[in-house]
Amino acid sequence: MNVLSGIGEFLVLFGTVFYFLSTLGLIRMPDVYNRMQTATKSVTLGSLSTIIGVGLWALGEGLSLAWLTKTIVIAVFLLLTNPISAHTLIRGAYKSGIPLWEGSVVDKYKEHLKEKEGAE
Protein backbone atom coordinates (compact mmCIF):
# COMPACT_ATOMS: atom_id res chain seq x y z
CA MET A 1 0.00 0.00 0.00
CA ASN A 2 1.33 3.42 -0.88
CA VAL A 3 0.49 6.92 0.30
CA LEU A 4 -2.29 7.53 -2.25
CA SER A 5 -4.07 4.33 -1.26
CA GLY A 6 -3.83 5.31 2.40
CA ILE A 7 -5.22 8.78 1.75
CA GLY A 8 -8.00 7.29 -0.37
CA GLU A 9 -8.93 4.80 2.33
CA PHE A 10 -8.97 7.58 4.93
CA LEU A 11 -11.24 9.73 2.75
CA VAL A 12 -13.65 6.83 2.22
CA LEU A 13 -13.77 6.29 5.99
CA PHE A 14 -14.22 10.04 6.54
CA GLY A 15 -17.15 10.04 4.08
CA THR A 16 -18.72 7.08 5.84
CA VAL A 17 -18.59 8.98 9.15
CA PHE A 18 -20.38 11.92 7.53
CA TYR A 19 -23.05 9.58 6.13
CA PHE A 20 -23.59 8.32 9.68
CA LEU A 21 -23.86 11.89 11.01
CA SER A 22 -26.39 12.65 8.29
CA THR A 23 -28.47 9.70 9.42
CA LEU A 24 -28.40 10.98 13.00
CA GLY A 25 -29.48 14.41 11.79
CA LEU A 26 -32.43 12.96 9.91
CA ILE A 27 -33.58 11.20 13.07
CA ARG A 28 -32.92 14.02 15.55
CA MET A 29 -33.99 17.20 13.76
CA PRO A 30 -37.51 18.51 14.43
CA ASP A 31 -38.83 19.59 11.01
CA VAL A 32 -38.34 19.07 7.30
CA TYR A 33 -36.22 22.20 6.89
CA ASN A 34 -33.69 21.27 9.57
CA ARG A 35 -33.57 17.69 8.32
CA MET A 36 -32.94 18.78 4.75
CA GLN A 37 -30.19 21.17 5.86
CA THR A 38 -28.49 18.46 7.89
CA ALA A 39 -28.80 15.87 5.17
CA THR A 40 -27.59 18.17 2.41
CA LYS A 41 -24.48 19.42 4.17
CA SER A 42 -23.28 16.12 5.55
CA VAL A 43 -24.18 14.00 2.53
CA THR A 44 -22.48 16.48 0.20
CA LEU A 45 -19.28 16.38 2.24
CA GLY A 46 -19.54 12.62 2.74
CA SER A 47 -20.10 11.97 -0.94
CA LEU A 48 -17.29 14.28 -2.01
CA SER A 49 -14.77 12.69 0.29
CA THR A 50 -15.90 9.17 -0.59
CA ILE A 51 -15.79 9.81 -4.33
CA ILE A 52 -12.39 11.54 -4.24
CA GLY A 53 -11.14 8.82 -1.89
CA VAL A 54 -12.14 6.10 -4.35
CA GLY A 55 -10.31 7.93 -7.12
CA LEU A 56 -7.13 8.27 -5.06
CA TRP A 57 -7.41 4.68 -3.85
CA ALA A 58 -7.71 3.42 -7.42
CA LEU A 59 -4.78 5.55 -8.53
CA GLY A 60 -2.70 4.26 -5.62
CA GLU A 61 -3.50 0.66 -6.53
CA GLY A 62 -2.08 1.16 -10.01
CA LEU A 63 -5.26 1.70 -11.99
CA SER A 64 -5.34 4.37 -14.67
CA LEU A 65 -5.52 8.10 -14.11
CA ALA A 66 -8.96 7.97 -15.75
CA TRP A 67 -10.40 6.74 -12.44
CA LEU A 68 -9.28 9.88 -10.64
CA THR A 69 -10.41 12.12 -13.49
CA LYS A 70 -13.88 10.56 -13.55
CA THR A 71 -14.27 10.81 -9.79
CA ILE A 72 -13.27 14.49 -9.83
CA VAL A 73 -15.82 15.22 -12.56
CA ILE A 74 -18.51 13.40 -10.57
CA ALA A 75 -17.52 15.27 -7.39
CA VAL A 76 -17.73 18.67 -9.12
CA PHE A 77 -21.13 17.77 -10.57
CA LEU A 78 -22.35 16.69 -7.14
CA LEU A 79 -20.93 19.82 -5.52
CA LEU A 80 -22.87 21.99 -7.97
CA THR A 81 -26.18 20.10 -8.06
CA ASN A 82 -26.77 18.84 -4.52
CA PRO A 83 -27.16 22.25 -2.79
CA ILE A 84 -29.28 23.60 -5.65
CA SER A 85 -31.65 20.64 -5.59
CA ALA A 86 -31.94 20.83 -1.79
CA HIS A 87 -32.74 24.54 -2.01
CA THR A 88 -35.43 23.82 -4.58
CA LEU A 89 -36.98 21.10 -2.42
CA ILE A 90 -36.97 23.33 0.66
CA ARG A 91 -38.52 26.21 -1.26
CA GLY A 92 -41.22 23.90 -2.59
CA ALA A 93 -41.94 22.65 0.92
CA TYR A 94 -42.22 26.23 2.18
CA LYS A 95 -44.55 27.28 -0.63
CA SER A 96 -46.67 24.16 -0.01
CA GLY A 97 -47.36 25.44 3.48
CA ILE A 98 -45.32 22.99 5.55
CA PRO A 99 -44.86 24.88 8.82
CA LEU A 100 -41.55 25.71 10.43
CA TRP A 101 -40.72 24.15 13.76
CA GLU A 102 -42.23 26.18 16.62
CA GLY A 103 -38.73 26.75 17.99
CA SER A 104 -37.67 28.57 14.82
CA VAL A 105 -37.19 32.23 15.65
CA VAL A 106 -36.36 33.71 12.25
CA ASP A 107 -38.22 33.38 8.96
CA LYS A 108 -36.25 35.51 6.50
CA TYR A 109 -38.07 34.09 3.49
CA LYS A 110 -41.43 35.28 4.87
CA GLU A 111 -39.93 38.74 5.38
CA HIS A 112 -38.60 38.66 1.82
CA LEU A 113 -42.02 37.72 0.43
CA LYS A 114 -43.67 40.57 2.37
CA GLU A 115 -41.12 43.06 1.02
CA LYS A 116 -41.65 41.72 -2.48
CA GLU A 117 -45.44 42.12 -2.18
CA GLY A 118 -45.02 45.65 -0.82
CA ALA A 119 -42.81 46.64 -3.76
CA GLU A 120 -45.41 45.61 -6.33
Curated annotation (Swiss-Prot):
GO terms, molecular function: sodium:proton antiporter activity
Coiled-coil regions listed: none
Lineage top rank: taxon: Archaea
Pfam families in the record: PhaG_MnhG_YufB
Family annotation (InterPro entries): PhaG_MnhG_YufB
PANTHER family xref list: ANTIPORTER SUBUNIT MNHG2-RELATED
Family of this protein: Belongs to the UPF0091 family.
Record-given protein name: UPF0091 protein PH1455
Organism the protein comes from: Pyrococcus horikoshii (strain ATCC 700860 / DSM 12428 / JCM 9974 / NBRC 100139 / OT-3)
